[in-house]
Amino acid sequence: MDRGVLPQAIALLLAVCSFGPTAGLAEGVQCDLQPVDPKVTYTTSQVSEGCVAHVPNATVGVHILFLEFSKEVSTLELTVQMTNPNGARPQEVLLILSVNKNIHLTLQVPEIPLHLAYDSKLVFLQEAPKAVITELPPSTTKNQLFLWANTKGSIISAAELDNPQSILLRLDQAPTSPSRCTLEPRKDMGHTLEWKSHTQASVLGCHLEGVTGHKEAHILRVLPGSEAWPRTVTVEVELSCALRDPEAVLILQGPPYVSWLIDANHNVKAWTTGEYSFKIFPGSNIQGVNLPDTRQGLLEEARKLNASVIASFVELPLASVISLQDRSCGSGLQPSPTTVQITPPGEGCNQDLLLSLIQPRCSDDVMTLVLRKDLISTLGCTITSLTFWDPSCQAEDTDDKFVLRGTYSSCGMKVAENVVISNEVVVNLLSSSSPQRKQVQCINLDSLSFQLGLYLSPHFLQASNTIELGQQGFVQVSMSPSIPELMTQLDSCQLNLGPDVEMVDLIQNQEAKSSCVSLLSPSPGGDMRFSFLLRGYVVPMPTAGILSCTVALRPRTWSLDVHKTASTRLNIVSPGLPDKGLVLPAVLGITFGAFLIGALLTAALWYIHSHTRHPGKREPVVAVAAPASSESSSTNHSIGSTQSTPCSTSSMA
């Protein structure tokens, strides 16, 4: 047998054996629990307040995260998943982030039409996601935000989290959930949301008086959740023993509907409620025992198992994964003298977060960046100087912030077409002998102009402001001036037909919304192009509309997008109406039709003349009834009908 498997097999055999009570133990347990070194983290779906709804026919599914942080600056990893890509889901997803402090956000999202709403003054994105960004309304309470979210779509989930470190949000809807999302205290979000907290669990330990030996006990008590349904809790145990290999007992107590999957790198004896199994033998379920559900009772249980040390005692909310790390491993209980955390000298200044706060803005021929001193202090940093590449351009030191600014013609600025402005920011820190440098860029949108034109042919020769129902339109968006350092892409395009008609989405998240829309190759000059087919049942009546497109602008050495919108007004008419001027094909058609009618009329007159006889030689004429109206009704019925097209507009209607 493999050496790595042998200890686990021995642990499994030992776990099956019964632990009999030790004779001669005193009735009371003398144990003074104190904070100790072992580290316990956990992932849970329990939130302080939340709700989950099932809205199968929602066009826009809204998910809200109310995030409360204790520090002025925190980091957050947010992962959005779609477990079943082929399952029922809204056409669009709106994710709302409401935060009370500054956060540095790392976001991972699937390839879906996603809208993201947050306060840009508090949320700093590590890199731009493929999402449409919306600014949250200012000074919004929880109730006001709920009302605002209801105007955007159907609320699928909402949750309030305290000090989250990482969040996993699954967009798959739970069929058993109610049809309306109503916030409930101590909500179990189930499969919809799991999260891990920045705040570590409180770990306590003690010596058990009157017990000799070196056996140590790790007690994990999982508290009941708001909903009782069968679930498995994975317990990861990592014991790093440098001096010796002590005996370890793992006591797991939880609600009766919880089973355990133990993944340990060390020989442990398991003593649990419910069923449990080891990861190396996942199919071998072992029946547990009845354990007391009080702290004193669990300490007594550890003493019965001859444990002389409670190496860790933790009470946790209902979790899906619990991770226990103990590096002292029975080498003697070392209670922490105080719960105050001392920051190691090498970790005093979080330089990565500090550099992420440097976000310049360009306007009125000036690049400006502002660093708040309270954020700098929270990161443990002390700035001695802040300059551009040209050290003579130093930041202004005010009471509450550093302000660094420079005109486009000074401080070593590099300017491309008066639009893309770049420089280098140099930060000198008290804790570092070498300066920190960051390349910065911003876009002067005031110097850019965009033109959006509609054409009725793929040659893009003559722009038009009128289009017929059922006609294919070709759109070109051009930017002036054209700048090689600036990448452009159509982020979204919509056709607004007024307040009484639903918006027609053509492009979303830089992708065609349906098969009626085609993204075309750029023009030789780099102009963005696409085509769309305007179906009759998309636009219910001849009307006027506004075609608008949002362009994503990004310098080639920058990770964030800047957006600019261009629009034009369209007249939408029914086929055959004289709302459009005559173009060359129409003139040629009318000329040919007139010629054909004249030729047929001449031939008819010649035929009548050649067959006319003397009145006396004419034969009697027999009156014949007119043809039934059904012959002409079929022709009249087809007037005004439109031919169906193969493209699907299910996502546009």
Swiss-Prot record:
InterPro entries from the UniProt entry: ZP-N (IPR055356)
Tagged with keyword Cell membrane: yes
GO CC terms: cell surface; extracellular space; plasma membrane
GO terms for biological process, alphabetical: angiogenesis; cell adhesion; transforming growth factor beta receptor signaling pathway; vasculogenesis
Transmembrane feature ranges: 582-606
Residues annotated as glycosylated: 57, 306
Record's keyword annotation contains Zinc: no
Compositionally biased intervals (Polar residues): 635-653
Signal peptide: 1-24
Region (OR2): 45-198
Pfam families (UniProt xref): ZP-N
OR1, N-terminal part, as annotated region: 27-44
Chain intervals for the UniProt region annotation (Essential for interaction with GDF2): 269-281
Residue ranges, Cytoplasmic side: 607-653
Skewed-composition ranges (Low complexity): 625-634
Modified residues (Phosphoserine): 641, 644
Extracellular side, ranges: 25-581
Disulfide bonds: 31-206, 51-181, 241-329, 349-381, 362-442, 393-411, 493-549
UniProt-annotated stretches for the region Disordered: 625-653
Keywords: Angiogenesis, Cell adhesion, Cell membrane, Disulfide bond, Glycoprotein, Membrane, Phosphoprotein, Signal, Transmembrane, Transmembrane helix
Localisation per UniProt entry: Cell membrane
Subunit structure: Homodimer; disulfide-linked. Forms a heteromeric complex with the signaling receptors for transforming growth factor-beta: TGFBR1 and/or TGFBR2. It is able to bind TGFB1 and TGFB2 with high affinity, but not TGFB3. Interacts with GDF2, forming a heterotetramer with a 2:2 stoichiometry. Interacts with ACVRL1. Can form a heteromeric complex with GDF2 and ACVRL1. Interacts with BMP10. Interacts with DYNLT4. Interacts with ARRB2.
Cross-referenced PANTHER family: ENDOGLIN (PTHR14002:SF1), ENDOGLIN/TGF-BETA RECEPTOR TYPE III (PTHR14002)
Physiological role: Vascular endothelium glycoprotein that plays an important role in the regulation of angiogenesis. Required for normal structure and integrity of adult vasculature. Regulates the migration of vascular endothelial cells. Required for normal extraembryonic angiogenesis and for embryonic heart development. May regulate endothelial cell shape changes in response to blood flow, which drive vascular remodeling and establishment of normal vascular morphology during angiogenesis. May play a role in the binding of endothelial cells to integrins.
Record's comment describing the protein's domains: The ZP domain mediates dimerization.
Protein name per Swiss-Prot or TrEMBL: Endoglin
Name of encoding gene: ENG
